[in-house]
Amino acid sequence: ESQAELSRGCPDSDLDGVTDPLDAFPSDPFQWADSDGDGFGDNTNVPSGDDCVDVFGKSFEEGRHGCPDADLDGYADVDDLFPEDQEQWADFDGDGWGDNYFWENTTVADDDNLGMFITLREQRGDAFPEIASQWSDIDGDGWGDNQSSSNRVDNFPLRVSQWNDFDADGFGDNAVAGAYQPDACPKVPGTSTANDEFGCPD
């Protein structure tokens, strides 16, 4: 029952002292007003209170409620490093690529082998959120495509089964079954290709 001066004796479902017709939150005893009409109460003394009482907003992440959130990802613009990208909000390594990594596989023609195809990734976000010098991994092997980096460099960015090339002869060091053109002489540079023996002196 409401105890407010002009509505004493009227229904007050949450018993906060504000009658239901005047209570913006009739079932919440800790909230009753919503100045900006964004659905977050003006009482900031509770965790769910509106942190931007006079400004409409829908943020709810990182403990900041009811503040402007242009991309509607839940993160207030002031906390969002990508305020216009709904998929991204953080960038741990500061390389300009968001930490949320998504990809879709796509099949393309293999330019090095006529009539063959390879599977590559169409990427969004940072494939290496903790390595500032790497962000892309188009073949999905866990090694980065940025050749100028000194960290986890993929010497074969289009070959999922190869990444290292110790002798720098263009043939990969991974010799497991099914690997692409494995180097039969991984510590000695070579150009051999006959009989599937790649990378030996010729």
Feature map (PLM): residue ranges:
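Extracellular calcium-associated, cysteine-rich motifs in secreted modular proteins
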Residues: E1-D202
